[in-house]
Amino acid sequence: MNRADNNTTPWNWPVVDLDIRHGQQRTIPIPSALENVEYALNQLNIRVRYNQMTKEIELTGGNLLTNASLDVGITQLRSQLTAHHLRISKTETWDAVSAIAAKHPYSPVCEYLRECRKNWDGKAHIDDLFCLLKLDPKVQQNTDFCKTLLEKWLISAVRLAFNKGDIAAQGVLILVGPQGIGKTRFLYRLLPHSDWGADGITLDPGSRDDTMRIMRFWIVELGEVGNTLRKERMDALKQYITQKQDVFRKPYARSAEMIPRRTVFIGTVNELPGEGFLRDLTGNRRYWPIAITQVLNLPLDRDQLWGYIMNRAFDCQAPHYLSVAELAQLESLNAQHLLLTTEERLLLDSLNWNAPLDQWHRMTATDVCGDLCISPQNNRKVGRALQNIARRDSRLKTPSNHHQREYLVPPMKAPAWASPDRTEESGTAP
């Protein structure tokens, strides 16, 4: 680079050292004071900011190369500072830029959302988004409640974008449906810039690499949630989802610090018929499933949608958490997505669930074990299986007296050989 500008008007440095020699006063090489670096950046039209979404320092403007790495930008900046007689090492340049960036934080997500709020047309646009989701008719789910889950999750997304460390997400929206129906595409319909989100992420809360990676995005899709919800990760994941802050070491900082959580999660799962992805009913209030068969490619004014959500979140102060009544609805909904135990599968396969109700009988778990030739040692497991099925099937009533719990249970299936419609094999050629 041409060490130019030596003949231009001298800069009026804020901090200088004076040296008196032979009766004359003169300035020696300019010291690397923070004030001098800030002054030089202003003179060179170079902008330094800290991006709260990506967690990165941005160095732009002046004669710096565009789209270059921060390390390259620091090298170029130091060269320009040296050309203007600023005495500074590369380490000192890093320190100064980091300090200046910390004084100028910004969030591109927040800037976008403020603009959406400013230009909102005053109409509710949640229906426009909800219409993209074709609900699965085979799953018992209330349409209005599904829409409530979607809107409250969106409200949490904008609240966390502006989070100062006092807000926590309350749920992960989970789209349940077959592969190839556009579940991941739904995420990117929400984002004005695709690099604000990430998809197909498997999250292990105990992995520093996993948590560091997802912190750099606004909305993260947890692909194939069943893998993320592995049993050994469940407790850690429940705690992680609702954290208000994250431990993070900013670029080139010497120590880690607590920073506000600004990331929300959406999940996708390819749930097969008769399968589930939730491993137990306790603690599942953090998972908000909507079962769908397709994501439709209908028009959506994304900016107006976020303008409406901003209004709901900050003007109407609408909550992003579920009420007690809504939590009860969620428990009923989640019961349909439980991963079946061995005992549940046995009951579902062995009992005739299509039998008329007048053929059902009140039985204890012990009675059921006896009829199905199950060891009495498994009474408790069978009892829990009956309770889980009862949460999904209201016919399996669970009245109880002071001594035992009885269930209204269907009769056993007739063995195949006893079916009156079975065609006998003659053993002779037709």
Regions found by a protein language model. Give the residues of each.
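Residue-level preference for the first positions of well-ordered beta-strands
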Residues: 172-174, 219, 264
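N-terminal nucleic-acid engagement/recognition segments and initiation subdomains in replication
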Residues: 1-125, 144, 377-380, 388, ...
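P-loop NTPase catalytic core of nucleic-acid-dependent motor ATPases
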Residues: 101-215, 369
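Positively charged interface segments
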Residues: 270, 276-277, 281-283, 294-296, ...
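Phosphate-sensing "switch" segment of ASCE/P-loop ATPases
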Residues: 257-264, 280-346, 353
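Conserved AAA+/SF3 P-loop NTPase catalytic/coupling segment centered on the Walker-B
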Residues: 218-241, 277-283
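AAA+/SF3 P-loop NTPase mechanochemical coupling elements
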Residues: 210-215, 249-268
